[in-house]
């Protein structure tokens, strides 16, 4: 369980690095999210997509270009909480977030709160893995630690 949790967190960090570098390299806004029928949705599960995002934001339209899609493990879920409360994370052409400082909680399966990881991102687009209290997460999710 620990290995799966570490792998999921590392995969998310790698995907965020990729998205930020694409925004910087191509000088275009790039969005990361879980897409359902072309719209960014919560919670992030099943798959994540990185795409060049022109208006309207948070949706993959004809003018947008999908850059990468990764599949998540079957029971994995990524919770994204940000200042602007959007279902997506958007990197600007300068590599920062669109005023979306926040955090991700990665869970490999329901009830696996003790193996969850937290990744914090700031407005400049930099992120770090942080410590957190599993009991606080359990209260947020309405689950018992396990």
Predicted regions and their residues:
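N-terminal helix-rich module
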Residues: 1-21, 25, 29-146
């Amino acid at each position: 369980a620990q290995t799966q949790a570490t792998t999921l967190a590392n995969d998310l960090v790698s995907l965020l690095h990729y998205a930020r570098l694409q925004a910087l390299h191509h000088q275009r806004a790039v969005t990361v999210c879980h897409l359902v029928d072309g719209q960014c949705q919560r919670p992030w599960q099943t798959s994540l997509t990185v795409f060049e995002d022109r208006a309207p934001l948070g949706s993959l339209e004809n003018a947008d270009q999908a850059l990468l899609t990764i599949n998540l493990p079957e029971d994995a879920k990524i919770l994204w909480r940000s200042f602007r409360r959007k279902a997506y994370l958007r990197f600007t052409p300068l590599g920062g977030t669109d005023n979306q400082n926040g955090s991700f909680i990665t869970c490999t399966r329901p009830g696996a709160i003790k193996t969850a990881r937290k990744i914090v991102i700031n407005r400049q687009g930099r992120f770090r893995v942080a410590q957190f209290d599993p009991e606080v997460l359990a209260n947020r999710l309405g689950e018992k630690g396990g």
